[in-house]
């Protein structure tokens, strides 16, 4: 299964991808983590952009994702978290899929109220010490999401791929909603 997760910062994309990855036995490919893991000398400018709440350049992300998707564990499917984030990335990814005779199965849109998101991001910033979760950057990240990523929903709705998920509940309830949406029966996360 090939699934893209779209949602604002703090919606739980990474958490839900991890849970679903174990169940489906496909890799969770999170571009945010991949970008944060770049060596400082090779990714200094990228880190500065991310620390300011901005996206990495499209061409850089497209190359990074293409390299990751070429690995053997991605052949049967994958869960994309943080990609695509822009119309340029989505259009280029569509072309890559067509060239490989592949298609996306779903785009899961994790929806959460602004109040819930702000609280989640504040807590995550305290526990994970992520510069991009500091209160100073939260609103800027929301603005960027609304301007550049949210419009991708229309792109994928036209393809009939978007499934809206209420992600304001607990981790386990959101996971159950995703499984129901995918018509997929799973053991609870505690059992896996």
Curated annotation (Swiss-Prot):
One of its GO terms (cellular component) is cytoplasm. Residues 30-56 are annotated as: NMP. Its EC number is 2.7.4.3. PROSITE patterns: ADENYLATE_KINASE. Residues 123-133 are annotated as: LID. AMP binds at residues 31, 36, 82-85, 89, 130, 141. It is found in: Cytoplasm. Consists of three domains, a large central CORE domain and two small peripheral domains, NMPbind and LID, which undergo movements during catalysis. The LID domain closes over the site of phosphoryl transfer upon ATP binding. Assembling and dissambling the active center during each catalytic cycle provides an effective means to prevent ATP hydrolysis. Monomer. This is Adenylate kinase. It comes from Rhodopirellula baltica (strain DSM 10527 / NCIMB 13988 / SH1).
């Amino acid at each position: 299964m090939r699934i893209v997760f779209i949602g604002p910062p703090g919606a739980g994309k990474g958490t839900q991808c991890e849970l679903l990855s174990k169940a489906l036995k496909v890799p969770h490919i999170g571009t945010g983590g991949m970008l944060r893991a770049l060596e400082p000398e090779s990714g200094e400018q990228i880190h500065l952009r991310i620390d300011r709440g901005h996206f990495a350049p499209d061409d850089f992300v497209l190359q990074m994702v293409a390299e990751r998707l070429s690995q053997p564990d991605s052949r049967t499917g994958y869960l994309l978290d943080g990609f695509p984030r822009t119309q340029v990335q989505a259009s280029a990814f569509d072309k890559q899929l067509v060239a490989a005779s592949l298609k996306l199965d779903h785009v899961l849109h994790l929806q959460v109220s602004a109040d819930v998101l702000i609280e989640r991001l504040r807590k995550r910033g305290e526990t994970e010490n992520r510069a991009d979760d500091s209160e100073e950057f939260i609103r800027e990240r929301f603005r960027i999401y609304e301007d550049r990523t949210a419009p991708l929903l229309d792109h994928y709705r036209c393809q009939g791929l978007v499934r809206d998920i209420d992600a304001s509940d607990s981790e386990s309830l959101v996971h159950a909603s995703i499984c129901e949406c995918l018509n997929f029966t799973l053991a609870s996360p505690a059992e896996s």
